[in-house]
A protein has these predicted regions:
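Class II aminoacyl-tRNA synthetase catalytic cores and aaRS-like
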Residues: 1-271
Length: 271
């Protein structure tokens, strides 16, 4: 018996073949129709369970959120919404989910609600789509710069530099914040700290990238960046990923051409 991802089954549609799939239950209707999703695609695969052939104790373990392994035959679907479905011959429960308390039910949830369920929200269509786009964008970013002769560099996350100089930074310290050592002027004595000086989470990899560009010509950074401005707006984030290319011998026109070409290329790739 072949083990497939749901994406493979929906693309190949090997009708008549026996298949084994694993995934999480999105819905279980009429004690008969299971909509299963394994994360390989945003689309679900319908699995038909003839409840007369299965023990009632097993069926009671199947609810939204449960993890299952289903084996059966891929057949043409007689219903609407899908072209093929699995006629289940065997169902194994990897793990159950309490139907009364499992939070991600088959309905629309607000973003505020999902923010409180961060460990499960990727199972919703909204967040699974967002993560697929982010994954494709990340790959596109690296592909673009690699194809255009850039070198990828890892800028430090913990740093003593303030590349921007105009914003608040998250401090990083191993000192006892309740009883820090003080110098002669009554200020915190960071010479006793891990690095012997003040350190913070990076606000930009610009300075490090500029030094690398002076030896490699064209480099870019792409990684997490942190800002400690306490501004609760859609344009302020405490943590985000920033792209910073640095090129030696580029003038303003070349910089603008690169920016325009980069945006066009990455968007076309994702779309």
């Amino acid at each position: 018996m072949n083990s497939y991802s749901i994406k493979e089954l929906l693309n190949k549609q090997p009708v008549g073949d026996t298949a084994e799939i694993n995934g999480w239950v999105k819905t279980f209707r009429s004690n008969r129709f299971i909509a299963l999703n394994d994360g390989s695609t945003i689309h679900n695969l319908q699995c038909v369970v003839d409840f007369e052939n299965f023990d009632d104790t097993l069926l009671k373990q199947i609810s939204t959120g449960a993890a299952l392994k289903i084996s059966g035959t891929l057949v043409e679907s007689k219903g609407r919404g899908q072209s093929v479905e699995i006629q289940a011959a065997d169902v194994f429960v990897h793990g159950t989910a309490d139907a009364e308390t499992y939070p991600i039910q088959p309905k629309k949830h607000s973003l505020e609600f999902l923010r409180e369920k961060a460990h499960l929200r990727v199972r919703t269509n909204t967040f699974s789509a967002v993560m697929r786009v982010r994954s494709a964008l990340s790959f596109a970013i690296h592909s673009y710069f690699q194809q255009n002769g850039f070198y990828y560099m890892h800028a430090p996350i913990v740093t003593g530099s303030d590349a921007e100089g105009a914003g608040e930074m998250f401090r990083v310290t191993t000192l006892d914040t309740k009883n820090p050592p003080l110098n002669d002027t009554g200020e915190v004595d960071y010479t006793h700290d891990f690095f012997g000086k003040e350190t913070n989470l990076t606000v930009s990899g610009q300075l490090e990238a500029e030094t690398y560009a002076m030896g490699l010509g064209k480099v870019y950074t792409f990684g997490p960046t942190f800002r400690a401005e306490n501004s609760n707006t859609s344009r302020h984030l405490a943590e985000f990923w920033m792209i910073e290319p640095e090129m030696a011998f580029y003038d303003l026109d070349a910089n603008m051409d690169l920016s325009e070409d980069f945006i066009k290329w990455t968007l076309q790739y994702v779309l």
